[in-house]
Amino acid sequence: MNRSDQEAYLMLPIINELKQLGGQSTSKELKRNVVADDKLIQENVLTSFKKSLSTGRKYLPFNFPFNFAITNLVMAGMLERPKKGTLKLTKKARDFHGTGKELSDQVYEISLPEWYTRSEKNKKEKIALHQIKEVNKSELDIDDGLEEDN
């Protein structure tokens, strides 16, 4: 499975595991339980670190689809983050009883437009920041060209 397939697949186990845990859990506990209870997820995903070619830092590839699945579920109103590191089911998630495909379709219908909006906002902010840097640079160039009369 590619990353986006993993992300879509993880949504239902996340919801089901939170239901088993009483509707609320820490992210770490939830991740461990999802991996332990799902037969399609290899248990070594929580110990198989890779090294980033660009930074040299170690990371867990499983964290990417897991965290994006969580964020999409939050965007779709299925989960809440009452405090940092804690996830909580919403009524919408507690009432969901469909398939993984039905869940991911429902979630992506809401979250994909939100991702697009975020992306556009980030692009605009990046352009604005670049323009500010260019103005500041040109002001420095002008200042460097001025000679003081003594």
Segments (PLM) and residue ranges:
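Positively charged, polyanion-binding regions of nucleic-acid-associated proteins
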Residues: 2-28
